[in-house]
Swiss-Prot record:
PTM description: Unglycosylated because produced in viral factories instead of the classic ER -Golgi route.
Membrane topology: Single-pass type II membrane protein
First-listed, main subcellular location of the protein, grouped into a coarse class: virion
Protein name, UniProt field: Entry-fusion complex protein OPG094
Virion surface face of the membrane: 2-319
Residues covalently joined to lipid (N-myristoyl glycine): 2
GO biological process, any: fusion of virus membrane with host plasma membrane
Swiss-Prot/TrEMBL induction comment: Expressed in the late phase of the viral replicative cycle.
Signal peptide: none
Function comment: Component of the entry fusion complex (EFC), which consists of 11 proteins. During cell infection, this complex mediates entry of the virion core into the host cytoplasm by a two-step mechanism consisting of lipid mixing of the viral and cellular membranes and subsequent pore formation.
Coiled-coil region(s): none
């Protein structure tokens, strides 16, 4: 029987551990990484000492601190969005902000607390109450209010809460604008109603405009509420009144009733220079000129002096030589006879 032979292998110390990417993370340098996290999304923040946990929780109150591994490895789990409507709704570019001592900033500074805005906050109706009031005040941004009203007609939120918010907004806008449609937010509302181009939107436009005061109609709606003389004059023309009435061509289209707006869209208005060579008129004829005007007065409401226009055209028209025309006619007839 042979004996056993044992070999003693050399001993070596194990190689030093190599930290993983997660272990190299530093929560104090991750402000811009943590803030955009979506609802229920984990953000790994690396090892976190016990004495820093309270500080991190205070800085990120919208997140729950979660242990993910040995050595204090941790992560933050988003649970909520704490941004307020005034800070989130009155701009379309803000996703979060940092609040400290009652002041907000887009950049983190020591001691600040993160407050985040709901994703697509303008698409969910969460801004309707705040912006409805703000857009009637003295400090509103007209572009923001115009975009918000426009977005209301294209929302993808089909939840019960979202649809109810939209209905409430339409009702409040209708009530507000029926009193005075010249309010900027109402003019935007009428503009987007017109662009929406449905039967319901057209009916709402006409309802709102018909509720306006007599002063409003006299100032802004003279196309939709013409004088008796203007209506009688319109009987002389085959084209719609909206095509030649300066009160229509100069009108704010947001304040036109639907029938006037549609008629105006049928017009083919051309500005040109006119030369009349031969003009015959009687007592029932009517002459209206709109050509040759500058851009500033191209829709001038000053009446045309028809007698002077006719006299000017006759004076400058070429003189017809009837005897010469007769001779030419006889010559043509003779040539035709000879040719046959």
């Amino acid at each position: 029987m042979g004996g056993r032979v044992s070999v003693e292998l050399p001993k070596r110390d194990p190689p030093p551990g190599v930290p993983t990417d997660e272990m190299l993370l530093n929560v104090d340098k991750m402000h811009d990484v943590i803030a955009p996290a979506k609802l229920l999304e984990y953000v790994h923040i690396g090892p976190l000492a016990k004495d820093k946990e309270d500080k991190v929780k205070k800085r990120y109150p919208e997140f729950r601190l979660v242990n993910t591994g040995p050595g204090g490895l941790s992560a933050l789990l988003r649970q909520s969005y704490n941004g307020t409507a005034p800070n989130c709704c009155r701009t379309f570019n803000r996703t979060h902000y940092w609040k400290k001592d009652g002041k907000i900033s887009d950049k983190y500074e020591e001691g600040a607390v993160l407050e985040s805005c709901w994703p697509d906050v303008h698409d969910t109706g969460k801004c309707d109450v705040d912006l409805f009031d703000w857009c009637q005040g003295d400090t509103f941004d007209r572009n923001i209010c115009h975009q918000w009203i426009g977005s209301a007609f294209n929302r993808s939120d089909r939840t019960v809460e979202g649809q109810q918010s939209l209905i409430n907004l339409y009702n409040k806008m209708q009530t507000l604008c029926s009193k005075d449609a010249s309010v900027p937010i109402c003019e935007s509302f009428l503009h987007h109603l017109r662009a929406h181009n449905t039967e319901d939107s057209k009916e709402m436009i006409d309802y709102i405009l018909r509720q306006q005061s007599a002063d409003f109609k006299q100032k802004y709606m003279r196309c939709s509420y013409p004088t008796r003389d203007k209506l009688e004059e319109s009987l002389k023309y085959a084209e719609p009144r909206e095509c030649w009435d300066p009160e229509c061509s100069n009108a704010n289209v947001n304040f036109l009733l639907t029938r006037n707006y549609n008629n105006l869209g049928l017009c083919n208005i051309v500005r040109c220079n006119t030369s009349v060579n031969n003009l015959q008129m009687d007592k029932t004829s009517s002459l209206r000129l709109s050509c040759g005007l500058s851009n500033s007065d191209r829709f001038s409401t000053v009446p045309v002096n028809r007698a002077k226009v006719v006299q000017h055209n006759i004076k400058h028209s070429f003189d017809l030589k009837l005897h010469l025309i007769s001779l030419l006619s006889l010559l043509v007839i003779w040539i035709l006879i000879v040719a046959i």
